[in-house]
A protein has these predicted regions:
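Membrane-interface helix-loop junctions in multi-pass transporters/channels
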Residues: 1-124
C-alpha cells in the first residue's frame, strides 16, 4: 500500500514538472488543449499496454494516476468553462463539448494503439 502511494506521489511530481515545462513553452491560449490532448492520448496508450497484465501495477500507478493525472488538468478546464459561461454561454458549451470529445477520441486512439502494440509484441 505504501509503495503504491509513493508511486502515485512520485508520478505526480514528474507530471507537475512536465506541465510546468509546457506552460513556459506554449502560449496560454493553447496550453490546456495541448496538455489535455497529449495527456489523454498517452493515458490511452498506457492503459492499452497495461490492459492485460497486472505485472507492472506500480508502474501503471506511477505513469497513469500519478504522472498523467498531474500533467492533465480537469480543474483548469472547469475553471475556464465557468469563466466562459459568465458571458458566452454558447461558446462555453462548444468549448466543453470539443474539449471532452477531443480527449475521449485521443484516449481511444491511444488505447487502440497501445493494445495493438501489446498484441504485436506478444506475437513476436
Amino acid at each position: 500500500m505504501i509503495k503504491n502511494i509513493a508511486a502515485v506521489m512520485l508520478g505526480g511530481i514528474v507530471g507537475t514538472w512536465m506541465r510546468y515545462g509546457v506552460m513556459i513553452s506554449v502560449s496560454a491560449e493553447w496550453l490546456l488543449w495541448i496538455v489535455n490532448g497529449v495527456g489523454s492520448f498517452a493515458m490511452g496508450v498506457l492503459n492499452g499496454l497495461f490492459a492485460t497484465t497486472s505485472k507492472y501495477a506500480r508502474w501503471k500507478l506511477f505513469l497513469t494516476t500519478g504522472m498523467l493525472g498531474a500533467f492533465t488538468t480537469f480543474s483548469t478546464f472547469s475553471a475556464s468553462w465557468l469563466k466562459l459561461m459568465e458571458h458566452h454561454e454558447l461558446r462555453a458549451v462548444i468549448y466543453a463539448v470539443l474539449m471532452t470529445a477531443l480527449c475521449v477520441i485521443l484516449a481511444s486512439f491511444g488505447y487502440l494503439l497501445g493494445i495493438g502494440r501489446k498484441k504485436a509484441g506478444e506475437r513476436s
